Amino acid sequence: MDDAAARLRYTNVAIFLHWAIALLVLFNLTTGLLHDVVPRAVFAFHISSGVTILVLTLIRIGWRLTHKPPPYLPMAKWEYAGAKIVHFLLYCAMLLSPLTGWAMISAHADKPPAAAIQADAGPQPAPPHKPHRTMIWGLFVLPKLKPIADIANQPGGDAKLKETHELYEERHETMGWIFLGLLVLHLGGALKHQLIDRQRELARMGIGKPAERADSSL
């Protein structure tokens, strides 16, 4: 690879982060938007994958801030502006989608409603209720977001916590559809440059032969 081609290619770290996040996002969008038909054993990894996406995205942002990305290939000004906007929104989605999911989990009640406890107890005392725990890859417990979990300690906390859970569940699902739309735009733009403009766009992310020159005007 010559120097000019190397300048148009992302670093190996950026390429790894890009494809690792892409695969995890594809898994999560599939298991999330199709959760009614996805086997429970497969969906069990949805949360672990989401937390991993959040961590890798933070690493990717840190890497991007400390390592200048390569210049864009030649394109019209409107395409350049569109690419910048879509990239920014994708980063927002990679952060907000896992965070809304985390908030939803944090709004999961640690204890059943008092009425349910009394109904189950019968003549005998109810057994101790185990707090709901979310394991990440079976290695550690995902802590709850304290401001949300503490809602349970407020007057009428059970009802408020349920409302909060439903709110973030709706937001999380909405983020999934927004994320899917952004990915369609991102992939469509990349394929347009690769197949129609005959530019080696995919080579910038490690697929195929590298591009040969940059657009000096960008």
Predicted regions and their residues:
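Membrane-embedded alpha-helical bundles that constitute the cytochrome b-like, heme-associated redox core
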Residues: 1-218
